[in-house]
Amino acid sequence: MLNKLIKVIIPVILISIILLISLKTYKDTKNSQTNFLTLLPENTSLILKINNLDKFKSINSNKIINKLKNLIDIDFLINNTETIKSVLRHELLSDITSLNVSLHKTGNNNLSTLFTTQLSNNYISFNKNFEVREYDKKNIYTTDFNDNKFHFYKFENILFFSKSKFIIEEVIKTQYSSYNLINDLTFQNSYKTINNNADANIMINFKELANTSSIFFKNKLVVNNFSSWSCNDLEIKNDLIIANGFLSTNKKIEHYTDILENQEPKKIKITEIIPENTSDLFSIGFNDAKLLLENKNKLLQKNNNFWNWDKYRKSLIDSSNVNYNELIKKIDSEAGNFKTSHLNSSHNYNYFKSNNSVVLISYLQPIIKKIKTYNNKNIYYCLDYNLTHNLFGSIIQTNTPYFTIINDYFMFSDNANSIKYLIDNFISNNTLINSNHFIKYNTLLSQKSNLTIYSNPGKSFQKFHNDLRKDYKKKIKINKDSISNITGLSLQISNKGKLLSSDFILFYDRDFKQNLQEEWVVRLDTQIITKPYFVKNHFTNDKMILIQDTSNTLFAYSSEGKLVWKKKLNNKIIGEINSIDFYKNNKYQCIFNTNSNLHIIDRNGNYVE
């Protein structure tokens, strides 16, 4: 579910950038005094409201915009930009006083862009270059711009225009329907908080955005009940895109964010545990776990899923005497899931923080069994393999039976090797909080929140791109130089009384230097006690990598990560491992000391005589 949420957010950013770039040369537009929102169709997923187009003239000088532009096919970008410029230069639009852009899903896999503007004069004349047709007793006017047909419709002093005639027809239908966006209380409560003096405002309908996302991706993203409307002030800086605003909650608990009502924002500490190469993180912060579970169950009832959940809860009590309603009282202030990006593979995890891990592990004894100890950490198997999912909702992934405990955090995954990988990184202090790409980004985040979604585009963009539909794979391309310095994309939601604050951030770190990329990884069942040593292999003209474990076994690996040999030594290696040409014949051996012997070993693992 975390991946799905991230996939929804990234297209929003890219589409918004395309629209802003397309409009950057248009000048002197004033704020709209007429409420254009009343005629927007119900399938509106995003509204971009431009308040100061003068500031957008310099948008292309921003480094973050240039980097994002490099992810968009140049022909697609230029064609759309030039077409919009041509439309806005038309005499029909010479005196417009507002300009707004909205996105709509039309049909199964079509995205329609609707432009709305206020006219200074209620009377305008469509010249002979416009074709006219009637729809539901209203006139729609059509003309060509750069070989692209645009359709226009005027209602009072508001002009609508789009390349999609279908969305213009939807506007006309809305005029006669009972639907009115400004009567939607979730939108109304958020919209009244926006600042009309901001450079721009962006309003996001998460429900419709979930449907719109199916246009971009092969499979529909099931996040329909994540949230309602979020209305934000948008600011674009040289290295930063920020959208700050609010979304409202519903006491009837209709969306996942509604379950956060009355919860205090909490500090995000899981970053001190999870690996440096975390690509995506979904974190929930709360002060009342019992209330969170109750609200989550109300959401299940709303979606007709509570009966099955409660049936399983009762069966768990009967079989083990473990009760979710009692278990939740032993959970502290954090829960969520995260994903790491590692070579060509990934690891997925769920987690929650306990009040006291000793007390909780004791309570869970009837449904868990210890399977092994790894680097002084116990690894367990939980018979309730959907435990975290059942406690915190469908937004948390299923099937994570393996777990370990780190600093009172219960860390779950779908396989034991992923748990080992987590333990290795934690012991090595190779954690997200210490990573060079996250340190600067972390200063932009609110340290306390009720919900944080974080993604590192440099690590997650490949997966995002693979999931795109074929047509959009061509339009949105992978450019590692452009994406590597974009080190963070996040959404944070926090309780602010009757509303929830929402903060979007996209950050370009001009100073970030990518670490050397791992090409392979080896997992041993024991702990390594030496750093890797690189010695010459004259046969392959490459390097061999030598490491020693706690049993004093020396392992030799090729540069491709294949085990070449291993040898049991009498003691721990003292000092360095070096290369030597013992016979002066350009054939190299490795040389090192233990406390009782000098060792010279050839490339095959044999001692030199």
PLM region descriptions:
Residues 159, 348-350, 410, 554-556, ...:
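Hydrophobic beta-strand positions in blades of beta-propellers and related beta-sheet-rich domains
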